[in-house]
């Protein structure tokens, strides 16, 4: 077998492969012999059909199948021989396909980049330090109570935080517009759900009162047809209800699966959950900085085929997340290309760190992670057992642990600065990283 390789770009290879005619004929004859054993042709007993008849009827198809299989077989033989690592399937162009002659074809494909991860010493990481204080727990209890607020109808003028039941009709230049009218809408004053001036204009209104609000849609309003336009809203207040926060009692605690432990027990459970959230938030922010540092220190070119595959995965995820009667391939590829490229680059860099440092998932950390996740459930032992009985899910956890070990490896060489912050700042979501 003759093989030659040409580099047409940093990652693209053009490989010419020559397969000897003898190998082709051997493969064709093997297929014809297999066909002869099972062929049913009128006038001949099974297995007794002359080879000349078999050739006449089946040689063309046998040769086509043999050629296809040989191209696939010899392609992988050739890339192993040439020590190439293809990324994606090749584009194959036959050059010589004649009977009795050597088969020659050209395979064009991309290869994985060859690189060594460097620059770990230049990566700078700010690691947040925080604790959950009693005041933080108090604030969280207030949040939980507000999330379970009930509203009771009152006979008084509306004020901020009240919930109003309203009917309204919106008009522009005297004409009602699409989406500008509704009946029985529940609106909490001060929530910011409506355009500026709408909620403020209902403060002081009573049930049965009608108010006319002359407002202007903001310039950056999501509906461009309405942006910066003046509108008149006629609003009828059907009822006014004031918020009632639930008491911190056993009935309230039971909403969160905590029973018969009293306020101290509930506070302890809330604090435990907050501490778990805090650990995860700090770990996530450190990981994001490490990954961003690896990206900046290791600018690599990646195969277009891998980016395309990742774009397709992101399309499928988008359809699953947002639903709708749309097929993944109907979503424009450019919506996902930057994110896809970032994922592919990071995946290759992380894999190279694992390879360079000979990392393997620490099974002790795998169990710790599973137990940490299981602690959020009412029956953690069952959750732990489920993970260890389901290999695919267990392997997902191993992958996460391996990424954590990559982060630890980088932190050993990076410049790490600890910063003391409040709980609120520590758990605040980080800004999304820019695409690579």
UniProtKB/Swiss-Prot annotation:
GO terms for cellular component: cytoplasm. Keywords: Cell cycle, Cell division, Chaperone, Cytoplasm, Isomerase, Rotamase. Its EC number is 5.2.1.8. Gene3D superfamilies: 3.10.50.40, Trigger factor ribosome-binding domain, Trigger factor, C-terminal domain. InterPro entries: PPIase_dom_sf, PPIase_FKBP_dom, Trig_fac, Trigger_fac_C, Trigger_fac_C_sf, Trigger_fac_ribosome-bd_bac, Trigger_fac_ribosome-bd_sf, Trigger_fact/SurA_dom_sf. One of its GO terms (biological process) is protein unfolding. GO terms for molecular function: peptidyl-prolyl cis-trans isomerase activity; protein folding chaperone; ribosome binding. It is found in: Cytoplasm. Residues 161-246 form the PPIase FKBP-type domain. PANTHER family: TRIGGER FACTOR CHAPERONE AND PEPTIDYL-PROLYL CIS/TRANS ISOMERASE, TRIGGER FACTOR-LIKE PROTEIN TIG, CHLOROPLASTIC. Consists of 3 domains; the N-terminus binds the ribosome, the middle domain has PPIase activity, while the C-terminus has intrinsic chaperone activity on its own. HAMAP family: Trigger_factor_Tig. Belongs to the FKBP-type PPIase family. Tig subfamily. Involved in protein export. Acts as a chaperone by maintaining the newly synthesized protein in an open conformation. Functions as a peptidyl-prolyl cis-trans isomerase. This is Trigger factor.
């Amino acid at each position: 077998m003759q093989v030659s390789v040409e580099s047409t770009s940093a990652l693209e290879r053009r490989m010419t492969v020559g397969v000897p005619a003898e190998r082709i004929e051997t493969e064709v004859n093997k297929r014809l012999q297999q066909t002869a054993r099972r062929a049913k042709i009128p006038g001949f007993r099974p297995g007794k059909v002359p080879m000349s008849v078999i050739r006449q009827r089946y040689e063309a198809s046998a040769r086509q199948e043999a050629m296809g299989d040989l191209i696939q077989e010899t392609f992988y033989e050739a890339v192993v021989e040439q020590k190439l690592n293809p990324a994606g399937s090749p584009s194959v162009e036959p050059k010589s396909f004649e009977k009795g002659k050597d088969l020659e074809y050209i395979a064009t494909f991309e290869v994985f980049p060859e690189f060594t991860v460097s620059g770990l010493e230049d990566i700078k990481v700010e690691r947040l330090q925080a604790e959950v204080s009693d005041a933080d727990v108090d604030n969280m209890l207030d949040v939980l109570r507000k999330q379970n607020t009930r509203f009771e109808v009152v006979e008084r003028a509306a004020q901020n935080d009240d919930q109003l039941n309203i009917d309204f009709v919106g008009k522009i230049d005297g004409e009602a517009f699409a989406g500008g009218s509704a009946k029985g809408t529940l609106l909490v004053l001060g929530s910011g759900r409506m355009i500026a001036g709408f909620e403020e204009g209902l403060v002081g209104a009573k049930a049965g009162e009608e108010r006319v609000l002359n407002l202007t849609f903001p310039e950056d309003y999501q509906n461009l047809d309405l942006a910066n336009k003046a509108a008149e809203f006629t609003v009828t207040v059907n009822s006014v209800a004031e918020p009632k926060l639930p008491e911190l009692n056993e009935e309230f605690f039971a909403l969160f699966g905590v029973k018969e432990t009293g306020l101290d027990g509930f506070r302890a459970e809330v604090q435990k959950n907050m501490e778990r959230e805090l650990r995860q938030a700090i770990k996530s922010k450190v990981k994001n900085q490490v990954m961003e540092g690896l990206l900046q220190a290791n600018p690599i070119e990646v195969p277009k085929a891998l980016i395309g595959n990742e774009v397709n995965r992101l399309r499928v995820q988008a359809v699953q997340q947002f639903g709708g009667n749309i097929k993944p391939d109907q979503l424009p590829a450019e919506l996902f290309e930057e994110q896809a490229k970032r994922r592919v680059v990071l995946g290759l860099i992380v894999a190279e760190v694992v390879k360079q440092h000979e990392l393997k998932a620490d099974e002790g950390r795998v169990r710790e992670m599973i137990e940490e996740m299981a602690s959020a459930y009412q029956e953690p032992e069952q959750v732990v057992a489920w993970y260890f009985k389901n290999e695919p899910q267990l392997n997902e956890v191993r992958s996460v642990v391996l990424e954590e070990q990559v982060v630890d490896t980088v932190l050993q060489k990076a410049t790490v600065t600890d910063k003391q912050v409040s709980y609120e700042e520590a758990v605040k979501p980080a800004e999304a990283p820019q695409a690579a």
